[in-house]
């Protein structure tokens, strides 16, 4: 591998590889910190360019510290996207890049030959449990979507961060987060410098659709069709733009795609139809014997529409994402997993319902989740603004949604260890992986958690575990 590089050389390299002339205001804020050595928490809107900070820190760690970098994400799709992006930009520099997201029963010894490893939180937890020897040579841990600490899988993420800092003194941690009110708490927990920015490359307009009008507060868009979905899509296509619909279930995403296909199909040019026909064949032939879902997806793709959810085959997902980025597909109907980081912006993001099925029945989604979905509106380089649209069913609901969501502030991130079943499971996991072996080590381990930072009630936590 090449010799060490100065900060200026690394900055120049990152700008070149991304085709930028300069860093944006959020990135400049981060560069004012000690990004080469200190841990850092970056809290900024979706699509503000946080991954550029990750690229700078990664190159510095590999070239100057001669240590490995671990990049952990909440989703396989996200890890895969980052992996492909890095391979494309940097593999010619002699950086050995790997991805490891499956097979939880292995220490994945082969990874000792790589400099940069993309993984998921669950896989990283497994690598730590199996005491992969090469972990001792990690100099930088990048935690993508650290706001996921509050989610149902947040306890695993918290445990992974605690364990990595436990076994590696002086580990540099770079935590990337959507906009959250208590980013300072996470920074204190990680003993990290804090970068907070509201910068977005494309101006975001948030509005509410009701009674054939999209109200954006400062202006309104009147639509003609009585069916709101059709009206929004027709208006978007007339503007030569794309729309992304976030649906609460896979079935809803598929059904909406079926409904919209004939509308979109009518607007396609012969050249576009030919291109989509070829794409449709690729989607269909991913499997030797296509399933019913494969056939449905292929038939929709031919009409310029696709659905996107976790049930798609990896290769199909890749084809769909690429075609949407290239504007071949005009409308995408997706489940909210897509909001969690996969970079697929559209001029318009439409959210027909803010309710989700949970264990306790139908519940409104958190403001934070809405803001993440809305943040996908607007394509840098293509749009000067992006529009995020919520659908209201009545005038009072419209006002309430405006106050709660459009003007709403995302919720604080809180530790998932506050829930007893989760705490119990993580304690047993820490015992199984030999982080806890007596009362003292139990106390020491939990003193390093985000839970302890937030609540400071270590004694009551220990008492609960003892019970």
Give the residues covered by each predicted segment.
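Walker A/P-loop NTP-binding motif
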Residues: 32-36, 40, 51-66, 162-165
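Conserved pre-motif I regulatory segment
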Residues: 2-43
């Amino acid at each position: 591998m090449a010799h060490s590089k100065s900060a200026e050389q690394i900055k120049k390299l990152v700008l070149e590889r991304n085709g930028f002339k300069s860093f944006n205001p959020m990135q400049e804020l981060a560069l004012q910190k000690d990004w080469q050595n200190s841990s850092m928490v970056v809290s900024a809107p979706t699509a503000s360019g946080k991954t550029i900070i990750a690229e700078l820190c990664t190159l510095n760690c590999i070239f100057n510290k001669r240590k490995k970098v671990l990049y952990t994400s909440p989703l396989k799709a996200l890890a895969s996207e980052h992996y492909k992006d890095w391979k494309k930009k940097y593999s010619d520099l002699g950086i050995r890049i790997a991805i490891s997201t499956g097979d939880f029963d292995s220490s994945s010894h082969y990874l000792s030959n790589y400099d940069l490893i993309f993984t998921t939180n669950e896989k990283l937890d497994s690598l730590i449990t199996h005491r992969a020897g090469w972990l001792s040579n990690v100099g930088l841990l990048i935690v993508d979507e650290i706001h996921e600490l509050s989610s149902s899988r947040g306890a695993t993420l918290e445990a992974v961060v605690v364990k990595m800092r436990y076994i590696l003194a002086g580990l540099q941690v770079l935590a990337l987060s959507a906009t959250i009110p208590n980013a300072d708490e996470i920074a204190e927990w990680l003993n990290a410098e804090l970068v907070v920015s509201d910068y977005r490359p494309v101006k975001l307009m948030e509005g509410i659709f009701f009674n054939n009008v999209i109200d954006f507060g400062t202006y309104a868009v009147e639509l003609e069709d009585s069916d709101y979905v059709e009206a929004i899509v027709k208006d978007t296509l007339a503007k030569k733009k794309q729309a992304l619909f976030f649906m609460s279930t896979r079935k809803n995403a598929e059904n909406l795609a079926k409904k919209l296909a004939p509308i979109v199909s009518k607007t396609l040019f012969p050249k576009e139809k030919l291109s989509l026909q070829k794409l449709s064949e690729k989607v269909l032939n991913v499997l030797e014997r296509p399933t019913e879902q494969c056939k449905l997806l292929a038939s929709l793709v031919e009409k310029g529409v696709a659905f996107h959810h976790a049930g798609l085959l990896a290769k199909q997902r890749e084809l769909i994402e690429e075609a949407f980025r290239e504007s071949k597909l005009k409308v995408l109907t997706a489940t909210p997993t897509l909001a969690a980081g996969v970079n697929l912006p559209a001029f318009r993001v439409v959210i027909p319902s803010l309710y989700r099925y949970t264990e306790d029945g139908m519940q409104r989604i958190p403001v934070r989740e809405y803001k993440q979905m809305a943040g996908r509106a607007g394509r840098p380089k293509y749009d000067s603004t992006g529009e995020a649209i919520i659908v209201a069913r009545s005038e009072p609901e419209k006002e309430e949604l405006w106050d709660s969501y459009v003007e709403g502030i995302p919720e604080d991130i809180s530790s998932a260890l506050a829930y007893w079943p989760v705490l119990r499971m993580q304690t047993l996991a820490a015992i199984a992986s030999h982080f806890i072996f007596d009362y003292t080590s139990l106390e020491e381990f939990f003193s390093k958690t985000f839970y302890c930072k937030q609540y400071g009630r270590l004694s009551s936590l220990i008492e609960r575990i003892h019970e």
